[in-house]
Structures are given as structure tokens and as C-alpha cells.
Amino acid sequence: MKKMSDKRKRQEGRGTGTEKDYKPYIQAREVNSLGTCSNPIDWKTGRTVQLLSQGEDALWHILRWNDDIIDIREQYPLDLKRTFKIAGEYGIQHPGTNPMTTDFLVTMRNGQMIAYSLKPSKAVLEDKRTVEKLFMEKTYWVTQGVEFKLIFKTDINTILYNNIRLVVPYYKAEKVHDDASVIKHLIATKRIPIDMESAPLKVRLLKQEYEKEIALWRQRNSKLATF
């Protein structure tokens, strides 16, 4: 797909809105790395999310799993005048004439905001240009009182990521169709305490362990539980 101009994106309201009404500045179909892009559905808001890499997909799932986070805005555009000013003050070449973006701008339940930048590994810090752009991004947020966090894909807990991906398709009760999906629903809605970080979930064993909880859920949701 042909890249869209900044003017056109602004006209479409890209980078505006919150929660289910947020419109990311960049959409997955607009980048060349389509093989690693993904469009998961936010199980809490129903919005289609625009993620540009496998690392972004992993980090987004982990952030979304955190109930202290109430909003995640991906591909968030930075104010062009501010970034040009930062570039000028520190003698850094601005990356093009279009807005820079932050991978994720997160809003916490307590009102705190955190900006996340994701990189593949610490090896990228050996590249001077990458460090310059990260410095600009960090300066942009810190000067506005927003915490900035740099995350490396190599540090992401893939067990947690895969476990989250396993259960969240059953977040809504109407998606439940058998005992295995009941367990996944109960985990996704955090009605049963499960260690998600240490080992892959074994649904067969969990069905045995939480047999009473499954029966109780079916009893309370008899209109949905037709299996």
C-alpha cells in the first residue's frame, strides 16, 4: 500500500482519540514488514490494534494483561514542532519531515502516563543514529512529565506472552464452547489465580484441578453453556 502523507493522516484523525476510539498514526498495512505485522483485537475494548512487529505484539499483550493499565495507544505521533526544537537544541538531525512516533503510550489507572519504546536487543545501542533518535524520544516525553521506558524484545517473557494469547480469545463468555474454553475464560477474566509466567499452561490438567469452578460457571451461565 502506498504511504499516506502526514496531511492526509491528520485529516483522518490519526493519533487522536482514546481507548476504543483511538486511531493509530501508522497502520500495519502501510509498512513493508507485513510478515511480522499483526492486528489483534483488544479483548477489553474490541478495537483492532495496529502492531508492526512480533516484539510489539508480545509487549502489547503483556501490557494489556495488566489491569492497572486503562489505555494503550500504539504508534503514537509526537508533536513535530517539539521534536524539531529538541533536534535543534542538541544538534541532532531530525529523522525526516514527518512526525516521529512512540510505540506505546500507556495510561495507568492512577492517571500516570508511560511512553514505551521497543527495540530488538541492546545491540541497537551500538548504532549512534539509533541512540540519537531514542534520546530525542526520551527527551520529548520526560520534558512533559511522562515516564519513558526502553524495552528490548530479548527481555520479554515469552511464556507469559504465549499464555496470554492462549486465553484471551475466550475473554467474553459467548466465546466459550467447551470445558477447555471455560478454563481459558476464567483465566482471562482472572477469576482463578494462575501462574502465567513460569511455564506454559496445561489446560488438560487445569480442567481437572478446577472441575468445581467449571461446573459452577456452567450452572451460572446455563443459557450460554449448551455443551
Which residues are covered by each model-predicted region?
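Electrostatic, structured charged patches in enzyme active sites and in nucleic-acid/phosphate-binding
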Residues: M1-F227
